[in-house]
Amino acid sequence: MSTSVDYIEMKIPAEPEYVGIVRLTLSGVASRMGYTYDDIEDLKIAVSEACTNAVQHAYNDENKGEVSVRFGVFEDRLEVIVADQGDSFDFDQKQQDLGPYTPSHTVDQLSEGGLGLYLMETLMDEVKVQSNSGVTVAMTKYLNGERVDHGTTIKNYETN
């Protein structure tokens, strides 16, 4: 089991225009860790979906809140946690309503609104959703590709 190396945390207003800042930060962290271009794109899509869901569904117009994003940089993986303190939902029921999640079905067969959860589960190695007080989405992407450097901190990944 790998031990945590670095944590990077940020909070953004629950507004669509701030999701791009999360994507830029994620891209920089994943690039320095040695993820491939395709893996970085997968990470950006999945994390954008989680952030966009929080922005669209967590808060109402009168009660705009924040979205918290935490990057856990491990030697063999990147963990991203997206959390809000807004309205919760029953994830298991939602997933069942949205289905299908089997390889025999195509993305065209997903219910409307189900693409975000489907993408997160398809593009990431692990996805866990907690919906007790607000919603927390924890996603993990393992480093499968070749890395430039096998150091133990993000500083070791930098070339400058």
Curated annotation (Swiss-Prot):
Keywords: ATP-binding, Kinase, Nucleotide-binding, Serine/threonine-protein kinase, Transferase. Its EC number is 2.7.11.1. CDD domains: HATPase_RsbW-like. It comes from the Bacteria. It catalyses: L-seryl-[protein] + ATP = O-phospho-L-seryl-[protein] + ADP + H(+); L-threonyl-[protein] + ATP = O-phospho-L-threonyl-[protein] + ADP + H(+). InterPro entries: Anti-sigma-factor_SerPK, HATPase_C_sf, RsbW. It holds the Pfam family HATPase_c_2. It is an enzyme of class 2 (transferase). Transmembrane segments: none annotated. GO terms for molecular function: ATP binding; protein serine kinase activity; protein serine/threonine kinase activity; sigma factor antagonist activity. Negative regulator of sigma-B activity. Phosphorylates and inactivates its specific antagonist protein, RsbV. Upon phosphorylation of RsbV, RsbW is released and binds to sigma-B, thereby blocking its ability to form an RNA polymerase holoenzyme (E-sigma-B). PANTHER family: ANTI-SIGMA-F FACTOR RSBW-RELATED, SERINE-PROTEIN KINASE RSBW. HAMAP family: Anti_sigma_B. Belongs to the anti-sigma-factor family. This is Serine-protein kinase RsbW.
